[in-house]
């Protein structure tokens, strides 16, 4: 969403943090992984609370509609970006975890290819952690994001 906003309205976006996402296309096992994750989340008390906090009392309907929309995108191989990435001028941080089991297995390679396409990108991959990276290690993610926003190197 943030990448598309920056592509459409760069005047409104100073930086983009793209955490734990598949990249330009949804990976081959996306539909199966999404269905499993969403069904598991519906049974998990913490996830149910999170969804309700984010979406309101009708969270389950919202999650089901979002799930179906993503499945349709995957089946139809719908492009995920509204414009070519080459047109993105906004500084972008591609961040993720090498242990993320929700995203494509070649996430780092996809991030490198996207970084090659954009004019102002950085990549940071955590060695450990799940999905999304920002929840796996919030303090380290906050440091990386702050360094990126301040134009510092990402160590």
Pin down the residues of each PLM region.
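Flexible "cap/lid" loop of the alpha/beta hydrolase fold
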Residues: 1-44
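Active-site micro-motifs of SAM-dependent methyltransferase domains
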Residues: 23-24, 94, 131
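Short aromatic-enriched loop/helix-cap "lid" or pocket-rim segments at secondary-structure transitions
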Residues: 27-32, 106-108, 136-138
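Active-site nucleophile elbow and catalytic-triad environment of alpha/beta-hydrolase enzymes
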Residues: 68-84
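Short, conserved loop/helix-junction motifs that constitute active-site signature segments
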Residues: 85-89, 116-119
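Short beta-strand/loop motif that positions the catalytic acidic residue
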Residues: 88, 94-96
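Conserved loop-alpha-helix segment in the C-terminal half of the alpha/beta-hydrolase fold
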Residues: 96-129, 135
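Catalytic active-site module of serine/aspartate enzymes centered on a nucleophile-bearing elbow/loop
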Residues: 121-155
